[in-house]
Amino acid sequence: MEIKLYEDRYRDDMIFMVLQAKDALGRIPSINEDLLDIKKNYFDRGDMFWIAADDNDRVIGCGGYSRIEGTNEAFIHRLYIKASEKRKGIGSALLETIEVGMRGNGITAARVHLDDPPEQWFESYSFYPKHGYAEYEPRYMRKKL
């Protein structure tokens, strides 16, 4: 497994992986519009986005961040792991990469917005606290970097 900056050649494979990940969670698969143009929605704004690729260069995870305007904080976005690849440390490795990228760009705190209800998104609600995130209001967690 290798984590690398997103490139457009991974677009379709990443979108397919995200749809599979949502389906595995019992959600109706739909695509978030920001994933259709990572360059415009992340890189052109000074934000970052990564993918995790397996040994066959297939996308098995993704995630990025966007700075909160007027602050030294950023939201983590679209941290997804392919269902068959969960519990192998890929999510933790992606999160660490995202946090290192944030620190390198002067970001001092990371935030994450979690979906509702928590029972359907139990993995997210347990994943982030294991990595030092604490809830600061319902459905939102934060970590000082």
Model-derived features with residue positions:
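Short, charged helix-to-loop "capping" segments that act as catalytic/coupling loops
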Residues: V112-Y128
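Extreme N-terminal starter segment of soluble prokaryotic enzymes
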Residues: M1-E2
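Short glycine/proline-centered loop/turn elements that form peptide/ligand docking sites
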Residues: L95, E119-S124, Y140-L145
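Conserved acetyl-CoA-binding loop of GNAT-fold acetyltransferases
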Residues: Y128-P138
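Conserved GNAT acetyl-CoA-binding A-motif
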Residues: M102-D116
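Conserved acetyl-CoA-binding loop-helix of GNAT-fold acetyltransferases
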Residues: I81, R87-V100, S126, K130
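Acetyl-CoA-dependent GNAT
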Residues: L5-H77, K82, L95, G101, ...
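Short strand-loop junctions, especially beta-strand C-caps/beta-turns
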Residues: L79, S84, D115-P117
